[in-house]
UniProtKB/Swiss-Prot annotation:
It is found in: Cell inner membrane. This is Co-chaperone protein DjlA. The lineage of its organism: Bacteria, Pseudomonadati, Pseudomonadota, Gammaproteobacteria, Vibrionales. The keyword Cell membrane applies. HAMAP family: DjlA (MF_01153). It holds the Pfam family DnaJ. It comes from Vibrio vulnificus (strain CMCP6).
Length: 287
């Protein structure tokens, strides 16, 4: 039990402010002890692949991801049905059952608490990932997906996402770019952009104008998914594609410490990038 902060806080508070000072010092000391306890709950060793600590770090990443998702969902003041459904859908995509699913649900609920220590949790994520860019990026993208659960990002959710991005070491510009990419990815997916023909392709020729407009929108979203302009040449397209695939390759992420439960989501992200690239490649006519 950690009471060092409480003792010091109460002592100096009483010394300078009497009884009321002691009470205030006790409160400050409690906050200090809480932050110290959370910090010590993290992982102090560096690097993945050190025997048992690998599993511990993966568990930290896993639970923190769902806890922060809960925090994002609560940003508007009330968690919507769509956000709960998204969290459940993510658990389904990760094939979480039994104890694992309960752990994810418990973490999500913890994130909704008013005094959720976001900064300390993000610091533990950075320690657990050894600050690896691609793992931190994957963590941030999970939170962006959660924010888009009900189709739009509320200003309060955007503010929380900026806090998360800063806590993980990303700039506001980097976050806004990823928000644009994720929004484009959702539209692209709804229009049948991932692996296969567009849903509306069987419609009659009388809808040709609508289909052409839809195809144009899909292409525009494909460029946004890769983070490039529509006038990018073949070399620029390939460079952006290879960079994103290198950052999101499931096997590489697993080797660096991504929890195995999140492997399917990493595969979906790489398929999203591949589908966008294939559409652009077909449009520009290069191999």
């Amino acid at each position: 039990m950690q009471i060092f902060g409480k003792i010091l806080g109460a002592f100096f508070g009483f010394l300078f402010g009497g009884v009321f000072g002691a009470l205030f010092g006790l409160f400050i000391g409690h906050q200090f002890d809480k932050a110290r306890r959370l910090s010590q709950a993290g992982f102090k060793t560096a690097g993945f692949g050190q025997g048992p600590s690998q599993a511990q770090r993966q568990e930290e990443f896993f639970k923190s991801a769902f806890a922060v998702m809960g925090h994002v969902a609560k940003a508007k003041g009330q968690v919507t049905k769509e956000e709960i459904q998204l969290a459940s859908a993510m658990m389904d995509r990760m094939s979480l059952h039994g104890e694992q699913r309960r752990a994810a649900q418990d973490a999500f609920r913890e994130g909704k608490e008013r005094d959720f220590p976001l900064e300390q949790v993000l610091e533990r994520v950075k320690i657990a990932t050894s600050g690896r860019f691609d793992l931190l990026q994957f963590f941030l993208e999970l939170q962006i997906s959660a924010a888009f659960a009900d189709g739009d990002v509320h200003p309060s959710e955007r503010n929380v996402l900026h806090k998360i991005a800063r806590g993980l070491g990303f700039s506001s510009e980097q976050l806004e770019r990823r928000l644009q990419m994720q929004e484009a990815a959702f539209r692209f997916q709804r229009q049948g952009g991932f692996g296969g023909q567009q849903h509306q392709s069987h419609h009659s020729s009388s809808h040709g104008g609508w289909q052409q407009a839809s195809q144009t929108d899909r292409l525009a979203d494909a460029y946004k998914i890769l983070g490039i302009d529509a006038n990018a040449d073949g070399k620029e397209v390939k460079r952006a594609y290879r960079k994103l695939m290198n950052e999101h390759h499931p096997d590489k992420l697993m080797a660096k410490g991504l929890p195995p439960e999140m492997m399917n989501m990493a595969k979906e992200k790489s398929q999203e990038i591949q589908s966008a690239y294939d559409l652009i490649k077909k449009e520009k006519g290069f191999k």
